[in-house]
Amino acid sequence: MPDPTQNPNVTPELEQHAAPEAAAEAAPESSADVMPSLEETLRQAELKAAEHYDAWLRAKAEGENIRRRAQEDIAKATKFAAEKFASAMVPVKDSLEAALAVENQTVEKLREGVELTLKQLVSAFEGAGLAEENPLGQKFDPNKHQAISAIEAEGEPNTVINVLQKGYLLHERVVRPALVVVSKAKAQ
């Protein structure tokens, strides 16, 4: 026989949900214990959020400082990029001025002075990574050479047979293409 005190409409799930509510009503002092714990948890979360915000602000400022320093370094590098080359060119100018200052100069002495000055200039070019391009006898390369004319000649077509003006490369980049005359096949 069913228990007359038990409600037949109450399922075990409803009893489980009702149990915590009944326990909360039965023990009001335990809810007071729970509230300070929630307040303490909230306070700790707010402190942690403030710490994270402060760390984020510091990281953001550091990132901006790094970016600013990098821009300053780039500006300085751009401004003084030619400093090494310029300092290598000063002795060349000094040599030319000294040659012009001598009044009674023989042609041989003048030639010697010009040759020494040319050596200084070539050394300065090499120090700066500027290389001379003299393509005589090489296959024509439109990336490095500028053909002024093409003439019939013996040998393989598209070969440089005369260099009118040397070219220059700065670290493998063309600064000035060589002006050349290129061979073409003889007409049959």
UniProtKB/Swiss-Prot annotation:
It holds the Pfam family GrpE. Its main location: cytoplasm. It comes from Azoarcus sp. (strain BH72). The lineage of its organism: Bacteria, Pseudomonadati, Pseudomonadota, Betaproteobacteria, Rhodocyclales. The keyword Transmembrane helix does not apply. Participates actively in the response to hyperosmotic and heat shock by preventing the aggregation of stress-denatured proteins, in association with DnaK and GrpE. It is the nucleotide exchange factor for DnaK and may function as a thermosensor. Unfolded proteins bind initially to DnaJ; upon interaction with the DnaJ-bound protein, DnaK hydrolyzes its bound ATP, resulting in the formation of a stable complex. GrpE releases ADP from DnaK; ATP binding to DnaK triggers the release of the substrate protein, thus completing the reaction cycle. Transmembrane segments: none annotated. Keywords: Chaperone, Cytoplasm, Stress response. Residues 1-35 are annotated as: Disordered. One of its GO terms (biological process) is protein folding. Residues 19-32 have a biased composition (Low complexity). It is found in: Cytoplasm. This is Protein GrpE. Residues 1-10 have a biased composition (Polar residues). InterPro entries: GrpE (IPR000740), GrpE_coiled_coil (IPR013805), GrpE_head (IPR009012). Homodimer. HAMAP family: GrpE (MF_01151). Belongs to the GrpE family. The keyword Acyltransferase does not apply. GO terms for cellular component: cytosol. One of its GO terms (molecular function) is protein-folding chaperone binding. NCBIfam families: PRK14139.1 (NF010737), PRK14140.1 (NF010738), PRK14150.1 (NF010748).
